[in-house]
Amino acid sequence: MSAGNGTPWDATWNITVQWLAVDIACRTLMFLKLMATYSAAFLPVVIGLDRQAAVLNPLGSRSGVRKLLGAAWGLSFLLAFPQLFLFHTVHCAGPVPFTQCVTKGSFKAQWQETTYNLFTFCCLFLLPLTAMAICYSRIVLSVSRPQTRKGSHAPAGEFALPRSFDNCPRVRLRALRLALLILLTFILCWTPYYLLGMWYWFSPTMLTEVPPSLSHILFLLGLLNAPLDPLLYGAFTLGCRRGHQELSIDSSKEGSGRMLQEEIHAFRQLEVQKTVTSRRAGETKGISITSI
């Protein structure tokens, strides 16, 4: 969405420098840009909530994912809606007429603009980061929790798991790596952009010292987080499938070895029984001959 709605307009705006479109286009662009940014921040949270539900409640219904997606898009729309009223075109008269799309005059005091920017920062960065940290922490704790080995002593109503699947360190390690990668990707993609933004908020004079292209590059880096998450999950899923295949092979080998040992043990017991029976028969025959 951000690539289709915001990036081409931004590229054209950077070429023309001033705003050449109408006022409604200015408001719409800034609304769509912020909505795309909100959705890029909220969708990884939805993925984290879905993964948490899949791990903690694997037999539960997955119908809640669509509701979470709808809530993420609806919340993105509502939080970006003020952009339609804050941004507008401003005309500067002079030897060279100039028009720009800005928020000049929308805030009566500097603290109001700073408060709005901090609120946006919390909704776009701090809250999603906290939510994902909680989700993936619960996933890691659930997967890393030591499982009671179930076998002949398993309580009634519980299934006995093969030993190759019980306490598998590879599954726990993959889950831990995935959680760390998701959080690290979100932090690396968005932190530079928001650090630069906070620098602007508390020191507006820095706007003249930092090239505008830097903020655009950092913004695109932040939006890169959205397509990276599905790639990480895809790589993790392929790794899990390979791991499950290896575990299946190991368990089948273990089962075959166990069956072979049981057959050897049964064969040895049969041989012992035959030997004992033949000895007893010989002793009985010897006693009968002696008595004669």
From Swiss-Prot:
Molecular-function annotations in GO: gonadotropin-releasing hormone receptor activity
Cell location: Cell membrane
Membrane topology: Multi-pass membrane protein
Cytoplasmic side: 50-67, 137-177, 238-292
Entry superkingdom: Eukaryota
Pfam families attached to this UniProt entry: 7tm_1
GO cellular component: plasma membrane
UniProt PTM comment: Phosphorylated on the C-terminal cytoplasmic tail.
Biological process, per Gene Ontology: cellular response to hormone stimulus; G protein-coupled receptor signaling pathway
Tissue note: Expressed in many tissues.
Residue ranges, Extracellular side: 1-28, 89-115, 199-216
Transmembrane regions listed in the UniProt entry: 29-49, 68-88, 116-136, 178-198, 217-237
Cysteine pairs bridged by disulfides in the record: 26-101
Keywords: Cell membrane, Disulfide bond, G-protein coupled receptor, Membrane, Phosphoprotein, Receptor, Transducer, Transmembrane, Transmembrane helix
Presence of the UniProt keyword Membrane in the record: yes
Entry similarity comment: Belongs to the G-protein coupled receptor 1 family.
Function comment: Putative receptor for gonadotropin releasing hormone II (GnRH II) which is most probably non-functional.
Protein known as: Putative gonadotropin-releasing hormone II receptor
Source organism: Homo sapiens (Human)
Name of the gene: GNRHR2
